[in-house]
């Protein structure tokens, strides 16, 4: 079963991802929705998560720092960046952090 944390500050995007995942995948549980990096870190510490969908441009702690933190706390979790930015520097940083996938 996928236990997913969605990290996205835009409510419409967050809700769309949640609905899409729940309607199209079997064995999915959305265990948390974070609107900021701070909320994401709190949820990483307190919830059973094995897949993270992380936006890069979020308030507080940015998405890359959330990913870095998640990699330390949840080394086996799948981490997917969700972003509207197609900047090479973001992709390069994501590779260094061993992100599993990158969705534009």
Model-derived features: positions:
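Non-catalytic signal-transmission and effector/linker regions of two-component phosphorelay proteins
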Residues: 1-3
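Class I S-adenosyl-L-methionine
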Residues: 15-22, 45, 71, 92
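Acidic, metal-coordinating helix/loop segments flanking the phosphotransfer/catalytic sites
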Residues: 18, 33-51
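CheY-like receiver
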Residues: 41-43, 50-104
């Amino acid at each position: 079963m996928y236990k997913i944390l969605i990290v996205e500050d835009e409510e419409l995007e967050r809700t769309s991802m949640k609905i899409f995942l729940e309607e199209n995948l079997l064995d999915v549980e959305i265990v948390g929705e974070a609107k900021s990096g701070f909320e994401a870190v709190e949820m990483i510490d307190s919830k059973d998560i094995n897949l993270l969908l992380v936006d890069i441009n979020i308030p507080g702690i940015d998405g890359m720092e959330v990913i870095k933190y998640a990699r330390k706390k949840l080394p086996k979790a799948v981490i997917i960046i969700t972003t509207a930015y197609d900047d090479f520097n973001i992709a390069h940083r994501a590779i260094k952090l061993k992100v599993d996938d990158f969705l534009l």
